[in-house]
Amino acid sequence: MTDSTIRIAIVGAGGRMGRQLIQAVTQMEGVVLGAAIERKGSTLVGSDAGELAGVGLLNVIVGDDLSQLTDNFDVLIDFTRPEGTLEHLAICRQHRKAMVIGTTGFDEAGKAAISEAAADIGIVFAANFSVGVNVVLKLLEKAAKVMGDYTDIEIIEAHHRHKVDAPSGTALAMGEAIADAMGRSLKDCAVYSREGYTGERKPGTIGFATVRAGDIVGEHTAMFADIGERVEITHKATSRMTFAHGAVKSAIWLGKHDNGLFDMRDVLNLNEL
């Protein structure tokens, strides 16, 4: 990929996140919207992507077949669903197009497919593209190393009523950051639900609680609770635009990488801290 203006394609262009991504592209330097894609049969196919997102005419017509638009973009941004993202991944890999993946809810096979594709193309794959959330992940690593062994750890997350996966990808990323810092596997210590007679809390576990209500953009709290005190590290998002700007920033950053699997901590250089 060259250092010239990067052409962005957005799938799910008519959705809440898709429209925010289109807006973000128009607000940031070094990028232009090259393609916009919606699902086959959508009434939005054929409309102008800029008018769809409320930013005026962009002369980019919403299409429904990514494979026919690969000459129009350098980086694909995908915040859709796992099955769709994996289809787009195969197309991008075939045509050597980079990807920014914000889709959550992948199973192990899906994650493996992303890792394999990164041998050929550059991919930024993150549960959350907010700068603040990724700073929180770094803080959680530090807190877990100091307090993790003697505190009860709980992660509470809340999202809007339309979110289809639980716990959120961000909540799982928080759990993984904590578990990794303590030398554990999240698979072995996560507790995802409690109901009925559960007995006392088992030491060394990481609990998850989920709220789905209203129009909550995203709220996440990690709690380290001891007798007499507790530490809570919280992030609250009030607009999807924070995720959109992070995703576009990642696309720009990918311009310097022909292949490899990265996350937002790489983009923000947080791994050096």
Swiss-Prot record:
Tell me one GO biological process term: diaminopimelate biosynthetic process
Q: Where in the cell is it found?
A: Cytoplasm
Residues reported in the UniProt entry to bind (S)-2,3,4,5-tetrahydrodipicolinate: 160, 169-170
Give the EC number: 1.17.1.8
Keyword Cytoplasm in annotation: yes
**Entry's NCBIfam families?**
dapB
Which protein family is it in? Belongs to the DapB family.
Instruction: State the function annotated in the UniProt record.
Output: Catalyzes the conversion of 4-hydroxy-tetrahydrodipicolinate (HTPA) to tetrahydrodipicolinate.
Write down what this protein is called.
4-hydroxy-tetrahydrodipicolinate reductase
Gene that encodes the chain: dapB
